[in-house]
C-alpha cells in the first residue's frame, strides 16, 4: 500500500450503491455458549409484519459468543414453562432455553412480545419480560430481546440495538454519488443522511449518539461538519485553508480533535465546540492525524510519520511531548482505544497485508485480529466485544466485524458496489 493511503484524511473512497447491508457469517466461535432459541408462538391470529424470532436469533449468532441451536434439531417447540422438558434440552447440550410468544391487540394495533430465558441445568428462569410496540417497532423489540439475553448469558451488555454509520459510493459512468448512511447494527433499515457528488469521509459519532461529525469535499475542498442524526440539521465547524480532517469526539462531547494544515503542516488541534476555540496539540514537520481520545479523556492516540513511516503515538489531551507507542513493523495507523482504555486497536502491515491489530498498553503485547488483507478504519462496539472495519472481499469494499475475544467473523457487503468508513455508535436511547 502506497504511502498516501496512510493519509486517510485525503483518501478518495471507492464506490458502492445505497441499500441495506447483507450479513454473511464467515466464522463462528468454538467457545460459543449453546442456547436453544425456540421460535416464538404466534398468538396474534395473523401473520407478523416481521419474524421477530429470526431477528434476535441472528443477532445472537452474529455475536460469536452465543450459538443458537439449529431449529431442525429441536425436539419440541415450547412457548411457556409448563411445556418445557428440560431433560430433552440438556441431552442436546443446551445451557439455556429461550421461549416466548407474540400477541396482537387489533384496536390499539400493538404487539405484545413475551420472552423467558431458562437455565437448563437448574431449570430456573433467568429473565422474563413482556415488551410492546407497533409493527414498525418489531425490529427494535427483536434487538432488545437479543440484548437482554446476551447480557443474561454473558454478563456483558449487548450492542444489537446500536447503529453503524458508513459511507457508500454509487458509480454511474463517470459520475460518482457519495452517501453517508446510518443503519441498525445488523445492517438493516439504512437511512441516508447526506448525498453528494464529492467524497465524504471519517464519520464519527458523538458520545450521546445523536450527532455525527464527518468530512465533506462538497465545496471542492475538505470541511468538517457536525450533523444531527434525527433532524438532519448540520453545522460546518471548520473550513480552513488546506486540510480539515479526521474529527473525533472527546468523551464528554464538548470537543473535537481534528487535523488541520492551516498553518502549513498537518497538525492535531482540539476544537472546543462551546466557544469555537482552537488549541494546537502537535508542532512537527511530519503529518499528525487520525486522533482517538482515551475513555477518560486524558490521552489522545494518533498517527504520525515523524519517525519515517506511519506509527502510533500518544500525547496528553492538554498538550505536551508525544511518545511513540508502536515499534513492531513499518506501518501502524488509525488507532482506536478499547472501551476500558487498556488497549489500542489499529491497522498494522505485516507480510504485505494490512490487518486490524491490538496492543496491550500495560504489557506491550500485540495481536493480529483479522486474516483479511486490506483492512482499514477499525471502530469498536460500545461493549468492547467486537470491532467493525472496512476491507476487501472478491474485489469489493465491504464492512467486516471480528469478535475481540470470540474470534467470530462476518461481513456486511452492500448489494452493489463498495462500502467504507464504518463507525459504530455508542449506546443510544430510543
Curated annotation (Swiss-Prot):
One GO term (biological process): cell division
Keywords: Cell cycle, Cell division, Periplasm, Signal
Pfam families from the UniProt entry: PD40, TolB_N
Listed GO CC annotations: periplasmic space
Top-level taxon of the source organism: Bacteria
Signal peptide (from-to): 1-19
Localization annotation: Periplasm
Subunit structure of this chain's protein: The Tol-Pal system is composed of five core proteins: the inner membrane proteins TolA, TolQ and TolR, the periplasmic protein TolB and the outer membrane protein Pal. They form a network linking the inner and outer membranes and the peptidoglycan layer.
Similarity section: Belongs to the TolB family.
Job description of the protein: Part of the Tol-Pal system, which plays a role in outer membrane invagination during cell division and is important for maintaining outer membrane integrity.
Name listed for the protein in its UniProt record: Tol-Pal system protein TolB
Amino acid at each position: 500500500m502506497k504511502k498516501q493511503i496512510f493519509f486517510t484524511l485525503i483518501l478518495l473512497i471507492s464506490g458502492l450503491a445505497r441499500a441495506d447491508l447483507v450479513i454473511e457469517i464467515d466464522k463462528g466461535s468454538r467457545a460459543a455458549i449453546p442456547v436453544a432459541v425456540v421460535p416464538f408462538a404466534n398468538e396474534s391470529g395473523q401473520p407478523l409484519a416481521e419474524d421477530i424470532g429470526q431477528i434476535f436469533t441472528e443477532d445472537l449468532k452474529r455475536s460469536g459468543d452465543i450459538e443458537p441451536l439449529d431449529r431442525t434439531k429441536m425436539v419440541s417447540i415450547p412457548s411457556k414453562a409448563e411445556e418445557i422438558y428440560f431433560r430433552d434440552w440438556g441431552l442436546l447440550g443446551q445451557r439455556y432455553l429461550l421461549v416466548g410468544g407474540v400477541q396482537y391487540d387489533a384496536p390499539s394495533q400493538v404487539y405484545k412480545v413475551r420472552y423467558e430465558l431458562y437455565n437448563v441445568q437448574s431449570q430456573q428462569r433467568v429473565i422474563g419480560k413482556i415488551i410492546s410496540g407497533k409493527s414498525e417497532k418489531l425490529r427494535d423489540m427483536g434487538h432488545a430481546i437479543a440484548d437482554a439475553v446476551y447480557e443474561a448469558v454473558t454478563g456483558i451488555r449487548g450492542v444489537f440495538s446500536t447503529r453503524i454509520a458508513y459511507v457508500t459510493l454509487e458509480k454511474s459512468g463517470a459520475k460518482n454519488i457519495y452517501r453517508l448512511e446510518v443503519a441498525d447494527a445488523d445492517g438493516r433499515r439504512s437511512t441516508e443522511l447526506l448525498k453528494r457528488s464529492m467524497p465524504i469521509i471519517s464519520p464519527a459519532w458523538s458520545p450521546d449518539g445523536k450527532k455525527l461529525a464527518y468530512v465533506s469535499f462538497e465545496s471542492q475542498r475538505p470541511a468538517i461538519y457536525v450533523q444531527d442524526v434525527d433532524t438532519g440539521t448540520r453545522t460546518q465547524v471548520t473550513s480552513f485553508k488546506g486540510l480539515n480532517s479526521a474529527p473525533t469526539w472527546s468523551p464528554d462531547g464538548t470537543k473535537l480533535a481534528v487535523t488541520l494544515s492551516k498553518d502549513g503542516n498537518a497538525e492535531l488541534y482540539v476544537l472546543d465546540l462551546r466557544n469555537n476555540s482552537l488549541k494546537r496539540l502537535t508542532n512537527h514537520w511530519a503529518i499528525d492525524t487520525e486522533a482517538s481520545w482515551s475513555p477518560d479523556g486524558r490521552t489522545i492516540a494518533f498517527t504520525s510519520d515523524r519517525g519515517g513511516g506511519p506509527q502510533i503515538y500518544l500525547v496528553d489531551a492538554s498538550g505536551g511531548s508525544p511518545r511513540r507507542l508502536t515499534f513492531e513493523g513499518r506501518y501502524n495507523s488509525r488507532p482506536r482505544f478499547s472501551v476500558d482504555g487498556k488497549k489500542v486497536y489499529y491497522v498494522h502491515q505485516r507480510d504485505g497485508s494490512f490487518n486490524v491489530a491490538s496492543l496491550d498498553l500495560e504489557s506491550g503485547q500485540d495481536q493480529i485480529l483479522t486474516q483479511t488483507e486490506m483492512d482499514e478504519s477499525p471502530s469498536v462496539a460500545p461493549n468492547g466485544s467486537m470491532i467493525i472495519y472496512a476491507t476487501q472481499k472478491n474485489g469489493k469494499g465491504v464492512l467486516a466485524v471480528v469478535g475481540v475475544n470470540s474470534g467470530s467473523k462476518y461481513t456486511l457487503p452492500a448489494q452493489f458496489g463498495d462500502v467504507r468508513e464504518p463507525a459504530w455508535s455508542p449506546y443510544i436511547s430510543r
